[in-house]
Amino acid sequence: MSTFPPTLLDAMRDVNALLQAGDLRLAHEQLATIVEENPECVEALRLLAGTRQARGDIEGAETLLRKALALDPNWTPTLATLGELLLGSGRSDEAEPMLRRAAQRLPRAALVLARHCNDQQRPAEALALVAPLCVGGQADAEWVTQHVAALAALGRQDEAVAFYRRLAEASPDNLAATHAMAIALDAAGRPAEARRAASHVLARGHRTAAIHFTHARSLIALGEFDRAEAALRDCLRLEPRLADAHSHLARLVWMRSGDSAQTTATLDQALQAFPRDDALWAAKAAILQGAGDAKSAYACLATQAAQAQAPPALLVRAGLAALDFDPATARALAERALRASPSSAARSLLAAALLGIGDARGALDECETLLAGAPDDQYLIALQTTAWRLLGDERHLAFCDYAQLVLPQQLQAPAPWPDLASFLADLKRSLERLHDPHGHPLLFQSLRHGTETTEDLIRNADPVIQALFLAFDTPIRNYLAHIGHGSDPLRRRNEGSYRFNGSWSVRLRTRGYHDNHVHPRGWVSSAFYVDLPDNLAASNHDGCLAFGEPGIATVPALPARHVVHPEPGMLVLFPSYFWHGTVPFASEQARLTVAFDVLPDTRREHA
């Protein structure tokens, strides 16, 4: 890019000062004048595009950025800005090449691309982008989060902890390194250590939105909800547009109040201040849908979605809400999003919507396109098998052989307990301490009328819970031997080894149940029964685990195909792509379970 003449340089400095002060209106006016007088000033075009985008004119911003790129195809900031805009619009096929070019010179571009790769379950690519920039211990929280997320997705959480612990211990005054260690500890399911590290950073006066957010996450995992809420509010005072923090705060408020208005109150204040922030609107829609109010979720996006130039990502979010009650509208929104950008999120929505309007053949075509690029996505496999079932395709019977692939086993009492009953009694006491006796169901989860724990139980220090997960090893290995090897999505990944990938406990009260769902990022999933109501009878299905009824609308509707009657001490293992849910029951006693997912253990490759 050519050097600015002195008068233009002064004008650009004035614009930068306005942008830093947050005066977008005046900055936009001055940039428009600069571009009119200097139509070949690439950086002015880029900044003007930024102000256009901030004002909601995505199409105008893209036009300006493409003009700037035509003037100087190698100006890295333009490549990065246009790539990020396209990515935000769901046009990843166009965005990724630009961001890869920009990432060679601009760390921000590498960060944006790494976040996208992690979101798309491509952790190895994300790791290659961020690891080189995290070695010095000065990377900010966004970098560290993506680095740790990539390692965690690869099953290398402990490696992330060891890496950042070395950096923190080598430079005790480097608070960024200590914060990075806290992020790694949180991702590894070690919340007590993460809390200590985050508290140390805060005590030293390093009070950023990011450290408050890390602190809050560790407190949530430890069940310290009042302190976690305070930390999230501190975070949002510093960064009121942080959608992740709003989502976490909403979870906390909802699980203790069950009131939608209270749950979104802080987010509503942010939306009053930033009414054009699509990420905040999408967060609100997700929260409302997670609270079971899909129609309100759709309503809060309907005005934006009706606009001709609505961003594809917003159309998809609105479509996900509509999918619960109006698949035809969801289909229309998905098709609009796909016309703007061929994103996997829009295509996945379209596949589900087509099942809801009776077009199983069309849904199958979309699934096969998506599975070519993401063969292990359990939700896509569930959509594919649902389409096969509707079409009478024999492949459904092979992939969904419930009699063969759903395996109940009775757990053996671990030492030193003399029998299973005494172990389950101790386990019940340990788990009940983790459940809020007055809590509401978590947002974004399948359960209704019950509570779910917030920490990863695998990392819980309680010796009874530790004994439980050691006792799971034999039945898991029995299951892997039972299913054997093959070319289907379950068996082709079976190398005889596994690692846990999340675990939790659920306590259902009377009328409690799980909506039908799958575990999108699992491989093998589970249900272990700790305590059951006395009045559950073998003569009916109340409180049973049911398989095969989709969690989305289909035409025609599909009933459950397989039912397991639970017993205390029973562990049921099954493919994560199986639709499954719990039949409601009526009892004064609670139904207490533990669940976990496992993935194939590929960590030996990195030993």
Describe the role of every protein-language-model region:
Residues 7, 41, 75, 106-109, ...:
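Residue-level recognition of tetratricopeptide repeat
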Residues 20, 54, 88, 119, ...:
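Register position in tetratricopeptide repeats
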Residues 44, 78, 109, 143, ...:
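TPR alpha-solenoid repeat register
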Residues 458-459, 463-473, 477-573, 578, ...:
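Catalytic core of non-heme Fe(II) oxygenases with the double-stranded beta-helix
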Residues 33-34, 67-68, 98-102, 132-133, ...:
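Canonical positions in the second alpha-helix
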Residues 47, 81, 112-115, 146, ...:
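Canonical tetratricopeptide repeat
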Residues 398-490, 513:
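Non-heme Fe(II)/2-oxoglutarate
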